[in-house]
């Protein structure tokens, strides 16, 4: 579903106008305006499961999916292809790194990402789910001291769409004892997301503390009130449409040319309940992502492999329609690529 809103159009017009202003500003006055520079104002945590970046998790293992035919845990892999595209912004100090003491910087980014997970246990190794997201993002960073920073991130509008794979759906439609008939639902929604960050240096190590949240636009919830291909309202819309999150990351202990890191992301996620009896409450559950590995130092360029790590997820299944699965786990080895 796509909710009508003028926010994206206004942001596009503002971005074009600011780029034109930057091009028309005399060179001596352009020190505080930047365009298409990837500045480190609010970098996603390594454990953030929704980050727009290039990440491959393989080899990996997963709990059985809700509609899998072959029972038991399975070998899987998942890939995220994405990027936060920097457009333009302002800064009080001409510096290509973090904001200095009592200095600030702000800008506009366009986050775009595409995610796929594949199951190798069921017949034909089906694509289980594909998700994509795009939107508009503003970031702000203020230097509290020479060694600490306040960061703010706001996504005023973004769209997320999720789709089960065709072969997964074919397998899900097979009858299996003790399982209800399969129904295909494609969650699709628009949302606002905010984040607040505190970062502090301890020698050469960096501690990051985060809080954020996602709230849906409109009253439709995460999915329509009807099945795909039908107009009959047979589904109960979601109502608990706010998802808070907390995160912490420690990055330091440099060994060779890379830093060690430990990153944790926690989200209070809604478990979908497509058919609820009158008065029946939806349930939310804490879901955890943990990443432990090594990464290149901040502002490093020309190194294709940015991170490698062990990744573990436990909680509500995060993949589209499969969020009806409350107790899900996934674990594997992750590899993040960049330039």
Q: Which ranges hold each PLM region?
A:
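Bacterial N-terminal signal peptides that target proteins for export
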Residues: 1-13
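N-terminal compositionally biased, intrinsically disordered segments and leader/signal-like regions
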Residues: 5-8, 26, 146
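Cleavable N-terminal signal peptides
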Residues: 16-17, 27
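N-terminal signal peptide c-region/cleavage motif recognized by signal peptidases
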Residues: 22-24
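Transmembrane beta-barrel domains of Gram-negative outer membranes and organellar outer membranes
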Residues: 30-142, 180
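Short loop/turn motifs that connect adjacent beta-strands in outer-membrane beta-barrel proteins
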Residues: 42-45, 87-108, 144-150, 199-208, ...
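Outer-membrane pore/translocation modules
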Residues: 99-250, 325-327
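Outer membrane beta-barrel transmembrane domains
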Residues: 215-339
């Amino acid at each position: 579903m796509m909710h009508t809103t003028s926010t994206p159009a206004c942001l596009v017009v503002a971005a074009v106008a600011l780029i034109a202003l930057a091009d028309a500003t005399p060179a001596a006055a352009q020190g505080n305006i930047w365009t298409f520079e990837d500045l480190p104002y609010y970098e996603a945590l390594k454990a953030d499961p929704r980050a727009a970046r290039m990440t491959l998790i393989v080899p990996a293992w997963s709990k059985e999916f809700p509609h899998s035919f072959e029972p038991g845990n399975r070998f899987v892999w998942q890939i995220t292809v994405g990027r936060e595209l920097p457009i333009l912004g302002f800064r009080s100090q001409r510096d290509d790194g973090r904001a200095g003491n009592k200095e600030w910087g702000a800008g506009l980014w366009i986050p775009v990402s595409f995610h796929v997970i594949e199951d190798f246990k069921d017949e034909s190794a089906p694509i289980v789910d594909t998700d994509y997201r795009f939107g508009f993002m503003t970031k702000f960073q203020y230097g509290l001291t020479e060694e600490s920073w306040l960061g703010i991130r706001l996504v005023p509008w973004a769209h997320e769409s999720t789709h089960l794979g065709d072969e997964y759906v074919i397998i899900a439609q097979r009858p299996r004892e003790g399982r209800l008939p399969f129904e295909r639902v494609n969650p699709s929604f628009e949302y606002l997301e905010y984040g607040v960050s505190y970062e502090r240096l301890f020698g050469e190590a960096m501690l990051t503390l985060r809080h954020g949240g996602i709230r849906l636009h409109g009253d439709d919830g995460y999915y329509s009130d009807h099945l795909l291909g039908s107009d009959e309202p047979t589904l109960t819309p979601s109502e608990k449409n706010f998802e808070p999150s907390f995160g912490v990351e420690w990055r330091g202990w440099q060994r060779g040319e890379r830093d060690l890191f430990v990153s944790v992301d926690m989200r209070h996620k809604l478990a979908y309940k497509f058919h609820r009896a009158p008065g029946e409450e939806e349930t939310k559950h804490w879901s955890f992502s943990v990443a432990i590995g090594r990464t290149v130092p901040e502002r490093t360029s020309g190194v294709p492999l940015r991170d490698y790590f062990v990744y573990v997820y436990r909680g509500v299944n995060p993949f589209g329609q499969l969020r009806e699965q409350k107790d899900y786990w996934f674990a594997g080895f992750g590899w993040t690529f960049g330039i």
